[in-house]
Amino acid sequence: MTNPVSRREFLNLLGAYGGTSAVLQAGVALGFMPSSSQAAEITLQANNGKKVAILGTGISALTTAWELTKAGYGCTLLEASHRPGGRMFTVRSGTVIDEIGNYQRCEWDNDPHLYFNAGAARIPSIHSNVLKYCKELEVELQVFVNESKTAWVQDDAMNGGKPVRNTDYSSSMQGFISEMLSKALGDSQLDSSLTESESEILLSMLRRFGDLNEDMLYKGSTRAGYGSGGFLDHGTKKDVVALRDLLKARNGGSVMVTTQEGTGSGPLLMQPVGGMDRIIYAFANRLRDRIKFRAPVTEVMVKDDGVEVAYEQNGVTEVLKADYCFNCIPSHLMSGIPNNFPTDYSEALNYIRRGRAYKAAFQAKERFWEKENIYGGITWVNAPIQQIWYPPHNIHGKKGVVLAAYNFGGANYTEMSQEDRIEDLLKHGEKVHPNYREMAEKPMTIAWHRMNHMLGCAPRWARDRGGWSDKEEQMYETLRQPVNGRHYLIGDQSTQHSAWMESAIQSAHYALADLDQRVRSEPA
């Protein structure tokens, strides 16, 4: 008899082969996870006189405060920083990047179109709770172009280091893969698994998918555009980059699937007009009287009948007493703040690691990418900068802000001076755009693992790339339960799909539902 596979093991295996998109879709289909296809309806018991302390002003904290305030709870939010939002952070003229050892103030032109989303930057259409709050709070949205086939793929080892258009790369890879699979249909093992009719159907699909010729060979495709002509004159196909050369691009897998699949991907996503922090300030402006800024928490004590939170503001230590506490302080920071949490809870808090994402951006003197027929999307570079993003808004304007680096594990940038960081992004960027260095004005960089009050970005639970261990699963479940029924940990750190606003919001909804059940069960 075979050993049964647990839910977690099943999702781990699925994730190893299909990525987070497959995990979430299967989890929803099998009832392991809530569907995000519909936004949650939050109904809380109203006007019960309860007081709630909310630690931090990330999107989970603001969601919590908004829903509780609408229900008549008394809420106080404590924020260590001078601004709300945590990792939902937009840089524009005058913005301070409070990175330890690399303080920067943005000096870009004071223009509403010139901004850089240094943290969260994209909203998929299936992130229904994010979209629900945008609608409720009247945050205007616009299209975010996640993929442009006219953007570039560059690797020093491919094509002599010369960049290749995304469309050339992806069309050719589709063609070569289709050609190889069509040849494999003659293999006895594969052929035996298909009927003659099924083989014919598959061959027809492969011919169309890869744009193969009558001999089922890939000889180039007009899908990649024409080398010349195509409108008034007959078009001629572009020269084909050989498969062996294409395979030298070590970021090819990202080019082929990152903007096509996944809960955070797709060619077309959304963003708020004017920057991602428009969502944050839509909440914060409505909760302004309840937020205390520059008020770092110094102690959290859970009592039988409530929670006491000590914090400092203006050099004075204050104590906030509340019936309940919702806490989105990053776990690795919270573990260093004096508290009386149970041992297993503290162990779980201290276990979660943090990502080290790095981003950089500059104001461009001209929208030079538009002269290359690029309007949004991502260029992939096999270098530490990894990605270049082009702004999809303010098309044909004078200037724009280019995201010049996005490295998910940017610890190597910590050791660099600001000058060296800038030189690194320029030298790799000019391999794609020869006038890159000339066009770049006033670059800004941000290493999230050095940001004050954050010291990291998205939480990382699993130590093993193959999935979660039983111990990690147990620690995760421990943090999802409120300490003494009074203290709730919220944010993407208490979800299985970190780094997304939708996850953080759903964590708040989960905790709010638990709170409401407890409040309703209390004796009158």
Positions of the model-derived regions?
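N-terminal secretory signal peptides and thylakoid transit peptides that target proteins
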Residues: M1-S21
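Conserved flavin/dinucleotide-binding core of flavoenzymes
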Residues: L13, A22, G31, A71, ...
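N-terminal glycine-rich phosphate/pyrophosphate-binding loop and immediately adjacent elements
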Residues: I42-M180
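Generic structural signal for small/hydrophobic residues in well-ordered secondary structure
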Residues: I59, G85, C134, F283, ...
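Active-site rim elements
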Residues: H113-P124, S265-V273, Y345-R353, F408-E419, ...
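Active-site/ligand-binding neighborhood in enzyme catalytic cores
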Residues: T150, A157, L181-P296, D304-G306, ...
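Flavin (primarily FAD) binding-site architecture
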Residues: N327-D344
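Central beta-strand plus flanking loop segment that forms part of the substrate or channel wall
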Residues: S346-E372
